[in-house]
Amino acid sequence: MVKMRRITPTRLLFTCRYISNNASPPVQPLNVLFFGSDTFSNFSLQALNELRQNNGSCGIVDNIQVVTRSPKWCGRQKSILKYPPIFDMAEKLQLPRPITCDTKQEMLALSKLTPSRQGNPENDGSGAPFNAIIAVSFGKLIPGDLIRAVPLALNVHPSLLPRHKGSAPIQRALLEGDTYTGVTIQTLHPDRFDHGAIVAQTEPLAIATMLSKGRVNDSTADFNSEGLPRRTAILMDQLGALGAQLLGQTLRERLYLPQNRVQAPTAYKPSYAHRITTEDKRIHWARDSAAELLNKLETLGPLHAFKEATAARKDAQNSVLKRILFHECKVMRDARLDNGSKPGMFKYDDIKDCILVTCRGNLLLCVSRLQFEGFAVERAGQFMARLRKRCGALSEKLVFL
């Protein structure tokens, strides 16, 4: 069971006043519209399904209908149709096929659905309606009219709210060097992301401890097809498992009801976890230390810088910038380039088969696998051997920009 602090019923009345404009949260079994998409969502969906399977003894969850985003074409020439990981989990749990919703209109249409006994949602108005929404890493704002149409609307968020509101709480916690993080169960605000009332929250959890545990040995890990960077994948697993426990506890103990006690919100400093952009993955050699770049790589995935190259066309400008992706790196703590080396300068170490790049503080980043724009990922030695052909005379200028 996840540790939670308790508060007085008076405080609870304040935190639970969000739920519906004229209705109390349901105590009858829940027919849940589950909004999710990624690996973090899988854990909560499993916990919810366990409550559904144990319905005879506890009567908490009756039906689950997964709602997710449409699959996307990706890969070279958009040749691969990639489904959100929640699709595979729903199939594994033998739940109805997920409904895909990408627009406000598509989501509002869900208010007409009712779960059928066969497990396929119907819109004929028969049967008990969906009476709960649970959103876990869905990625879109659920319309207020849909939220207000159900008595209960909850969200599982991987941070200690109000710290790291927004779409990238796990990545921002890692990038900003947070010592602790956690999971929050909050209500769904009808108009804004992460502005609901806190229903339950874990104690602060040491990030270093969670990272040391590695991936969760759970069937949800089988469905991590997202190719996440190491640190993000570990923290997503660890927080996903804890969030699932907290969600199960919240529903079993009905912590959302005014007469029940919930965890007291702690006064964490508010912050916003902005969506990860291409600029976040840009290397600034004079600003970033080698350790910071390694943390970025293991949090965001391949980073990029640029290499100046001679223009191939005679009528073009004298030089062009080619994007370089850095895929595999480590920090060299006991090595330095020449005394006159400046951030971004590099040389090849043939013994280690790596490219040594000077970073802020004059420490070196050892790059073993990287990728020149328009070419495949390659070892450092291959990159250096082909640099002349790709950059022309400017290959002699051993500087990443």
UniProtKB/Swiss-Prot annotation:
<keyword id="KW-0496">Mitochondrion</keyword>
<comment type="function">
    <text>Formylates methionyl-tRNA in mitochondria and the cytoplasm. Responsible for the formylation of the 8 N-terminally formylated (Nt-formylated) mitochondrial matrix proteins that are encoded by mitochondrial DNA. Nt-formylated proteins in the cytoplasm are strongly up-regulated in stationary phase or upon starvation for specific amino acids (His or Lys) and are targeted for degradation by a PSH1 E3 ubiquitin ligase-mediated fMet/N-end rule pathway. Increased Nt-formylation of cytosolic proteins appears to be important for adaptation to these stresses.</text>
</comment>
<dbReference type="InterPro" id="IPR036477">
    <property type="entry name" value="Formyl_transf_N_sf"/>
</dbReference>
<keyword id="KW-0648">Protein biosynthesis</keyword>
<dbReference type="GO" id="GO:0071951">
    <property type="term" value="P:conversion of methionyl-tRNA to N-formyl-methionyl-tRNA"/>
</dbReference>
<feature type="transit peptide" description="Mitochondrion">
    <location>
        <begin position="1"/>
        <end position="26"/>
    </location>
</feature>
<keyword id="KW-0963">Cytoplasm</keyword>
<dbReference type="Pfam" id="PF00551">
    <property type="entry name" value="Formyl_trans_N"/>
</dbReference>
<dbReference type="GO" id="GO:0005759">
    <property type="term" value="C:mitochondrial matrix"/>
</dbReference>
<protein>
    <recommendedName>
        <fullName>Methionyl-tRNA formyltransferase, mitochondrial</fullName>
        <ecNumber>2.1.2.9</ecNumber>
    </recommendedName>
</protein>
<feature type="binding site">
    <location>
        <begin position="18"/>
        <end position="20"/>
    </location>
    <ligand>
        <name>(6R)-10-formyltetrahydrofolate</name>
    </ligand>
</feature>
<feature type="binding site">
    <location>
        <begin position="66"/>
        <end position="70"/>
    </location>
    <ligand>
        <name>(6R)-10-formyltetrahydrofolate</name>
    </ligand>
</feature>
<dbReference type="InterPro" id="IPR002376">
    <property type="entry name" value="Formyl_transf_N"/>
</dbReference>
<dbReference type="InterPro" id="IPR041711">
    <property type="entry name" value="Met-tRNA-FMT_N"/>
</dbReference>
<dbReference type="GO" id="GO:0004479">
    <property type="term" value="F:methionyl-tRNA formyltransferase activity"/>
</dbReference>
<dbReference type="InterPro" id="IPR005794">
    <property type="entry name" value="Fmt"/>
</dbReference>
<dbReference type="InterPro" id="IPR005793">
    <property type="entry name" value="Formyl_trans_C"/>
</dbReference>
<dbReference type="GO" id="GO:0005739">
    <property type="term" value="C:mitochondrion"/>
</dbReference>
<dbReference type="Pfam" id="PF02911">
    <property type="entry name" value="Formyl_trans_C"/>
</dbReference>
<keyword id="KW-0808">Transferase</keyword>
<keyword id="KW-0809">Transit peptide</keyword>
<comment type="similarity">
    <text>Belongs to the Fmt family.</text>
</comment>
